[in-house]
Design a protein with these regions (language model features):
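Aromatic-residue-lined binding/catalytic grooves and analogous aromatic/hydrophobic interfacial grooves
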Residues: 1-429, 447-449, 466, 484, ...
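Alpha-helix N-cap/helix-initiation motif
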Residues: 35, 319, 361-362, 430-434, ...
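Aromatic- and histidine-enriched alpha-helix N-cap/loop-to-helix transition segments
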Residues: 41, 324-325, 363-368, 380, ...
């Protein structure tokens, strides 16, 4: 089996017509739009995206542009409620959790003001081609190395081949339909009607243009250019009739009023399909091939389609080749949603077919957006971090304003949820009374510095890192004994027995203390590297040294809140208090062995009560299991993502059946962590290699802090090859089976150790 080629002999609609193929769930007739769309192939370059799907006869591409969001012109600003902070703090000090939570939610999480609510990411429309006659569906496939989809159908005259990709060089959508005999059909561009959106069309024999205007918001347009050796004629607005063609080549673009709509829309690559694909695939495949995971597998499975292999895994059978494909698919999805983008990947990457998508397809700062980029540095996709960096830095103005108006603090505040417009306004009653968004996302920015050593980048993010520290300077409350308390505080998104609100407000939750400790550390290290702000560094260091301890309960578990509370949901999907175990390295056997063991007990407790019941949560569990060296636990939860939380095309699912991309992307981070984990200043080789993968395998091109590139192979769990290409850090330490090797080399030098 080619692990970067996803091959199927059934169309996407098969999974909405056959109950057995969708886990026995009832399907709508004639087919379920939502379910069918999720069985398609996602293609994209970050700015543009499309889901390629359809039935036995029709090709359908659901189109997206990263800036097509509602709400652009809403006047959103946080309420001026800082004067109420003391009241909420006093209630928490007195132990009146319920009233403190009620008032905190009212004052600091948006209350009931829907005007500040974020608005949803929107689909741009659909492009379809319906041939006049199709005898049979033959196959469809997605090449993960190039991002090219290919579909074959049998017609009375011969074989009709359709291809599509989104060009990461030319920055347009490309489609081509070819046949060895003339074909005819209808090319259509349309969008589902919506009451607040006005659509107009302009159609010629060579072009289709659709313009849309969303009331009180953004304008957008989709432009299609069609070239054929047959006859093309306008059949009606938005539709072209194609007759007697052996080739139909399409180039498409999308634009919004976020930029210069006319200029953006008129852009074309200036190349034919083959030339465009050649330049695109060169860049795309270079990035996909920077890292290579190889696992031993059963060659007898190579003849099966991907959906057949997924079904085998659901039946409890082993399939290393499918694990390898799932790993590569996650890398493909991050690349396709980030490489040319200005915005980071949202909850669904850049793919959405719904006018009102779940959670608005927004950006969640309490795990999801961070998880999307956990793998970016180790898989050597540093370019993909740029859209995330741009997005975060755009919050500075609104984040400073909200910090002042909500809490009377300097510095920057980020809400739990946000949309494309980077407004730091809390909008959801309950969950949004949380100050941890800015410190958590600062970890992603800091990691890019650790892996790249780019001093200009560090100077660029330094104002944000210090603004986070500055917020803590003002927000923390000092006890008489000198301890700095985080007040109010919460542990996303958990609550306790008897509380009528979705999240508990307390003093110094475990996660908030961990985030504060790390964020102050980033500011300190950055200032020292840049040789600035020595006075502020002294203050930040003092605060860090006087934060509350990481508390352990009487049963040996790490306490989630500042004291032992009865959890309303012991198996809660969030693992917020385990941030210090992963993605942070606060808790390791070397640094804090007691908290490390307590965190493991907390993880086991949560799982024993049904935790990890969403795709992203299960991915986090897999990361945690890999970090603690639990090889079989890692394998169990990694494969559960395929078995229990994936469509037949391996897209991650949130119950009941909602696509969320974070599980796909988090799974890659887990796979990396199982094979090479970096903490305590060392790269730990094969720390959680499961027995199912132990026979033979290799990982080549994984990136480490310091910019080092590591490649190694193993047989029967023992290293057989090991080499390092030295990065800017010049020194790297490797650990395996209790032994540590420290290598000193010149930048760019490749040293073969085994």
């Amino acid at each position: 089996m080619e692990h970067k080629r996803m091959y199927y002999t059934l169309p996407a609609t098969a999974w909405s017509k056959n109950d057995e193929k969708v886990g026995g769930e009832a399907a709508k007739a004639p087919w379920d739009f939502e379910r069918t769309w999720m069985e398609g192939f996602p293609i994209g370059n970050g700015r543009l995206a499309a889901m390629v799907w359809g039935d036995e006869e029709i090709d359908r591409l659901t189109l997206n542009h990263e800036w097509l969001w509602k709400g652009q012109h809403k006047n959103r600003r946080s309420p001026d409620n800082a004067g109420h902070l003391g009241e909420v703090r006093e209630l928490i000090r007195k132990g009146d959790w319920e009233e403190a939570t009620r008032l905190g939610n009212l004052y600091f999480s948006g209350g009931t003001n829907a005007d500040r609510r974020i608005d949803p990411y929107q689909p741009a429309g659909d492009l379809t081609f319906l041939p006049d006659q199709v005898k049979a569906f033959i196959s469809r496939e997605l090449d993960l190395e190039t991002g090219l989809t290919t579909t074959l159908r049998e017609t009375p005259e011969g074989t009709l081949k359709s291809e599509a990709f989104i060009d990461c060089e030319g920055n347009t959508l490309r489609c081509r339909f070819t046949s060895d005999a003339p074909f005819s059909g209808t090319l259509s561009l349309f969008r589902e009607p919506e009451k607040d959106t006005t659509l107009t069309f302009h159609t010629t024999p060579e072009t289709i243009r659709m313009d849309g205007s969303i009331a009180g918001g953004i304008q957008f347009a989709v432009q299609i250019w069609a070239e054929t050796d047959g006859i093309a004629a306008v059949s009606e607005e938005g539709k072209l009739r194609i007759e007697g063609a052996t080739i139909l080549s399409i180039e498409g673009n999308m634009a919004t009023s976020q930029a210069d709509l006319g200029k953006e829309l008129s852009h074309r690559s200036g190349k034919d399909f083959d030339a465009a694909f050649s330049s695109h695939s060169k860049r795309f495949s270079e990035m996909m091939n920077r890292l290579q995971l190889t696992l031993s597998e059963d060659p007898a499975l190579e003849a099966l389609t991907v959906d057949q292999r997924v079904q085998r895994v659901r039946e409890g059978k082993q399939d290393n080749g499918l694990c390898q494909m799932y790993f590569d698919y996650g890398r493909y999805l991050l690349l396709s949603s980030s490489i040319c983008g200005e915005l980071p990947a949202n909850l669904q990457g850049k793919w959405n077919n719904n006018m009102n998508p779940p959670w608005d397809c927004d950006f969640h700062f309490d795990i999801n957006i961070e998880m999307n980029y956990w793998m970016a540095e180790p898989v050597n996709f540093p370019e993909c971090v740029e859209p995330l960096t741009r997005y975060v830095l755009r919050f500075m103005e609104s984040g400073r304003d909200s910090a002042e108006r909500l809490y009377g603090c300097r510095g920057v505040y980020l809400p739990l949820q946000a949309d494309a417009w980077a407004k730091a306004t809390p909008e959801i009653f309950g969950w949004h009374t949380w100050i941890g968004g800015a410190p958590w996302i600062s970890q992603s920015l800091w990691n890019h510095w650790l892996y790249s050593g780019d001093r200009a980048y560090l100077e660029r993010i330094y104002p944000f890192l210090t603004a986070v520290a500055e917020f803590y300077e003002d927000y923390l409350v000092r006890d008489p004994d000198g301890t700095y308390q985080i007040l109010p505080s919460q542990s996303p998104e958990n609550f306790i027995v008897g509380l009528p609100y979705p999240v508990l407000l307390c003093q110094s939750s475990a996660m908030d203390v961990q985030l504060c400790y790390d964020a102050l550390g980033y500011a300190i290290s950055a200032a020292e590297e840049l040789d600035v702000d020595s006075t502020r560094v002294s203050l930040w260091r003092s605060i860090r040294e006087h934060l509350p301890p990481f508390r352990i309960g009487p049963d040996g578990r790490l306490l989630e809140w500042d004291r032992e509370f009865p959890e309303a949901e012991p198996g809660h999907r969030h693992l917020s208090h385990l941030y210090g175990l992963y993605p942070s390295e606060l808790f390791t056997p070397e640094t804090r062995p007691e908290q490390y063991q307590a965190a493991i007990r907390s993880l086991d407790f949560r799982l024993s009560h049904g935790g990890g019941y969403t795709g992203w949560s299960r991915a986090w569990v897999a990361c945690l299991k890999a970090r603690i060296g639990d090889a079989e636990g890692f394998y169990e939860h990694f494969t559960a993502l395929i078995k229990d939380f994936a469509t037949s095309t391996l897209l991650d699912l949130h119950p009941p059946r909602v696509f969320q991309i974070d599980g796909n992307l988090g799974a890659v981070a887990a796979g990396i962590e199982a094979l090479v984990g970096f903490y305590d200043g060392k790269a730990h080789l094969l720390p959680a290699l499961p027995k199912e993968w132990a026979e033979k395998g290799s990982l080549k091109g994984v990136r480490l802090p310091g910019g080092h590139l590591l490649s190694f192979a193993w047989e029967n769990g023992e290293l057989t090859e090991l080499s390092v290409t030295v990065g800017f850090g010049e020194t790297v330490s490797l650990a395996f089976n209790g032994d540590v090797c420290t290598l000193h080399g010149r930048v760019g030098e490749t040293v073969k150790l085994i």
